[in-house]
Regions:
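Active-site-proximal alpha-helix that buttresses catalytic centers in soluble enzyme cores
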Residues: 2-85, 92, 131, 167-176
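Generic beta-sheet signal
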Residues: 3, 99-107
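Glycine-rich phosphate-binding loop signature in dinucleotide/nucleotide-binding domains
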Residues: 43-45, 96-101
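Domain-level recognition of soluble alpha/beta enzyme cores
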Residues: 123-151, 155-158
Length: 176
């Protein structure tokens, strides 16, 4: 089973009196996530299930990924992906989805890095991982239990995903 860990795109700055969960992606954030998702698609990444934090910026990121993938799969909210959720609880909440071959999760830092570390080393502090906004990590989970250690297959920054998407698009477009 492959777990794709996706950090949400660039979001609006938080105003002092504003609800953090209501922050939306900026126009630049939307454009960059769309380009990064095109890179994922060019790499052959598939999603049987796409789970998202209920926070607006993560849900918007998941919706853009789905759009780039032709409307499937429809993102599902998973409250355990909310900002500040303990990584052990989040991994436990992923258990019912491990029967699928390709699962994507969209969420927030530092939780996503802690999930990657937990799955690879057994501890949320077991390794230093940093997911920039729009980054994606691919983990190979052995067996159906998140307690088995995962293998980090790759971790790509958003700029690399955008380049991959652009290079494939250039090859597919006819010369003028």
């Amino acid at each position: 089973m492959i777990l794709y860990v996706i950090r949400h795109g660039i979001a609006e700055e938080r105003a002092p009196a504003e609800d953090d969960g209501a922050r939306r992606l900026t126009p630049r954030g939307r454009q960059r996530i769309r380009a990064a998702a095109a890179g994922l698609r060019a790499l052959g990444v598939q999603f049987d299930v796409l789970l998202t934090s209920p926070l607006v910026r993560a849900a918007e990121t998941a919706a853009i990924v789905t759009e780039v993938y032709g409307g499937q799969p429809v993102p599902r909210e998973l409250p355990a992906l909310s900002q500040g959720a303990p990584p052990v609880e989040t991994v436990r909440a992923l258990q019912p989805f491990l029967r699928h071959k390709h699962v994507g999760i969209v969420g927030h830092e530092p939780g996503l890095s802690e999930i990657v570390a937990l799955l690879v080393t057994g501890s949320p502090e077991g390794m230093a991982v940093s997911l920039k906004k729009g980054s994606v990590a691919a983990l190979e989970l052995r067996g159906r239990s998140p307690r088995t250690h995962a293998k980090l297959r790759w971790l790509l920054a958003p700029r690399h995903l955008r380049r991959i998407g652009r290079s494939v698009r250039k090859r597919l477009l006819p010369a003028v």
